[in-house]
Amino acid sequence: MRPAFIRGKWLSRTLELATGLGRRTCSSRESGREVRVRFAPSPTGFLHLGGLRTALYNYLFAKKHGGAFILRLEDTDRSRLVPGAAESIEDMLEWAGIPPDESPRHGGPCGPYEQSKRLDLYHVAAQALLDSGAAYRCFCTPQRLELLKREAMRNRQTPRYDNRCRHLTPKQVEEKLSRNSPFVIRFFLQEGAQPFQDLVYGWTQHDVASVEGDPVILKGDGFPTYHLANVVDDHHMCVSHVLRGAEWLISTAKHLLLYQALGWQPPQFAHLPLLLNKDGSKLSKRQGDIFIQHYVHSGYLSDALLDLITNCGSGFTENQMGRTVDTLIQQYELGKTSTHSALLDLDKLPEFNRIHLTRWIEGTETRVQLVGQLQVLLKDTYKDLELDEKHIERILLLRKGHLCRLTDLLSPEYSYLWVRPSVTREQLQCLTSEASKVKNLVVRLLQENDSGFTLETLNGELRKQLKQVKDTKYSSAMKLLRVALSGQEHGPSVAEMLLSLGRQESIVRLQNALPD
């Protein structure tokens, strides 16, 4: 969408539309009664670990203070938008258990929540800055800007705009507009920026005018840059606190100058230290395992991923394993956030997931969810398999504490749970000459018990019964039974295998492996 101009002015219809949007501005910040925070990713890619961490800390802060968590999509870089990314970002937040209160999907009082649908607001703000002299039109061509960059590089200087168009006279501007010369709008950076207090980094000051040229705030296609858009949107959405990555700390001075030029009260800022790999290197999208979708498809629980992310950072009195989102909300304190980068050790994720999966298996409602998920996984892997929910639930309870992921049950070592192994009589008889006697003792034990065993009582009964086998060590008898039941020499205890398979299936397998 290209903005409409009449000799450099926005069309009056645009002003009317924007004024209507402006009326939706919330008033809670002025009253000081409501905390409102936002997570504002760009759908130029899918949600990654760094983004999830920023979203999580915003969510925790909002819920800790009874406030609102907003999802806003910064989709103004139209050339880099990735199809499906916008929808996926919100999907991943919902999967993680930190759903936004206001978003493109759910709406809200301060929408729309995509920047591409809020252009009128940016146009009005840009015009206000032009009218007050806080911004100006820049007619410099891309070729001239490239020459400036090359010259700076040649002199080993940081490239910066030389603010040339800042000094154009009104007559010169009028002449260029009359020729329909393309332009962008730049913000007039004032020297001597005032210090501000960041809620994490403390008092900070960056005189951006001394190191940067005047920044572009509205591009030639009518879309804003981040600097203008985030200020306008945070104001109109009445954001009370901005929690974002530390990479934006230096730019905050620039944003505060924009707030001042527009006559708006700024929110409070808290910049979160970067999330890095455990060796201190930057998280890279080339790693493959940086995207949240990877962990969803790999069978990890969202609780485990959030738990790991908060354990590697700060914001809590102490680190603990096994914390749920509700616990994180209770324990989170923004003031305890460190300025040191957070080192993420993804090698610990399986152990975090084991702890949370154990808790899910113990919970009645969450166990039902796991049973349903496992049924779907089994159906995809074993097309003709028919298992009742009670059978699957029994397996989960028996394997509680041993599984790192639900998908572990689809690995070859657990295949015996779902398909009968191929075992020959010769394989078993080479383990002991009393193979048939061992089998008959265990089959009779299973047939004669109607009340059911626990793992402990079955272990005791097996040991008692197998004392009748005089020439076979107990360990050899266990190995024989394990191979007959599973086709494997190693794995869970024989008692657990018998309980997992159930009485009838266990008897069938033993008799098939060692027919009379």
From Swiss-Prot:
Its EC number is 6.1.1.24, 6.1.1.17. ATP binds at H48, E247, K282, L283, S284, K285, R286. A motif ('KMSKS' region) lies at residues 282-286. The keyword Transit peptide applies. GO terms for molecular function: ATP binding; glutamate-tRNA ligase activity; glutamate-tRNA(Gln) ligase activity; tRNA binding; zinc ion binding. GO terms for biological process: glutamyl-tRNA aminoacylation. Keywords: Aminoacyl-tRNA synthetase, ATP-binding, Ligase, Mitochondrion, Nucleotide-binding, Protein biosynthesis, RNA-binding, Transit peptide. CDD domains: GluRS_core. It catalyses: tRNA(Glx) + L-glutamate + ATP = L-glutamyl-tRNA(Glx) + AMP + diphosphate; tRNA(Glu) + L-glutamate + ATP = L-glutamyl-tRNA(Glu) + AMP + diphosphate; tRNA(Gln) + L-glutamate + ATP = L-glutamyl-tRNA(Gln) + AMP + diphosphate. A motif ('HIGH' region) lies at residues 43-51. Belongs to the class-I aminoacyl-tRNA synthetase family. Glutamate--tRNA ligase type 1 subfamily. This is Nondiscriminating glutamyl-tRNA synthetase EARS2, mitochondrial.
